Design a protein with these regions (language model features):
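Processing junctions and N-termini across compartments
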Residues: 9-10, 32
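C-terminal motif of bacterial Sec signal peptides marking the signal peptidase cleavage site
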Residues: 12-14
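Sec-dependent signal peptide recognition
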Residues: 2-8
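Interaction/scaffold regions that mediate signaling and macromolecular assembly across diverse proteins
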Residues: 18-267
Length: 267
């Protein structure tokens, strides 16, 4: 990123006429403005105000015209963000925020609804402008987020506006908090019996469809930090010692819990 900025500066100095040269402060301001387009401050404010116990108060947000305008302005900046200039944890956080933000936007556009399946093509057909490209929610998750980072914890962070997903965070993801928040969401996942439970005497594990071969088993197995044989062993770092030992043994039958597509609406 620093190299790219430096090259751009050289081009400006070498190719511009003397009276067209911009002062250093102007160039720095332009770079700062471009970075701000990718920043999630406005989305963070919205989440803190409208997320209640992991659910979104869509009805209240829909009625708040000023906040809706601010939200749309944030989404417009996301659409114009030059994602080639962000990387690492900032890149990770950007795509989680984009996914969650456009989920909320999709629900607001279709409000009132009770189930996201009421929106035709919500995940795989409807496109949103992100980083000057038109992408579906599935594109954001499976092309921009999971492959480059190979971190399956993303499945605990992206929330497709339903109760099957881990409750949405009440703050935006940033380069500074993404690691800690991902681990927090993983711990929330294993503590919810709707997502995960074990019957040690009965040698049985019940876990969300997220871990099934039909869904995202391959993402957990491909995670660069994972060393187990069964996808469910991915949860070992987030459970108590007895459960961790049981999962690591591999001596159990895995059953997958049906996904709850009901809207994650507060109230």
């Amino acid at each position: 990123m620093r190299t790219h900025i430096a090259l751009c500066f050289v081009c400006l100095v070498g190719c511009s006429k003397p009276d067209a040269q911009k002062p250093k402060e102007t160039i720095q301001a332009a770079v700062s403005e471009q970075t701000d387009q990718c920043a999630p401050a406005a989305f963070d404010n919205l989440l803190r105000k409208y997320v209640v116990n992991g659910r979104v108060d869509y009805a209240r947000l829909k009625a708040a015209k000023t906040d809706l305008v601010a939200f749309d302005a944030y989404l417009d900046r996301v659409g114009r963000c030059d994602v080639s200039k962000i990387n690492g944890l900032e890149h990770y956080a950007f795509w989680v925020n984009a996914y969650n933000a456009f989920n909320i936007k999709g629900v607001l556009d279709a409000w009132p609804i009770q189930n996201i399946k009421a929106i035709d093509g919500f995940l795989d057909k409807k496109q949103w402008k992100v980083g000057n490209a038109l992408l579906t929610l599935n594109d954001m998750e499976y092309k921009e987020l999971i492959p480059p980072h190979k971190d399956a914890r993303a499945h605990f962070a992206v929330v497709c506006a339903d109760l099957g997903s881990v409750p949405i965070a009440d703050r935006a993801y940033t380069a500074q908090n993404v690691e800690a928040t991902l681990d927090q969401k993983a711990r929330e996942f294993v503590k919810d019996p709707r997502n995960f439970s074990v019957d040690i005497p009965g040698k049985r594990v019940r876990v969300s469809m997220l871990f099934s071969p039909e869904w995202y088993e391959k993402d957990f197995l491909a995670d660069t930090r994972f060393k187990g044989k069964k996808a469910v062993e991915y949860l070992v770092p987030y459970v108590d010692q007895e459960t961790a030992k049981f999962l690591a043994s591999g001596d159990y039958k895995v059953e997958y819990i049906d996904w709850d597509w009901s809207l994650n609406a507060a109230g």
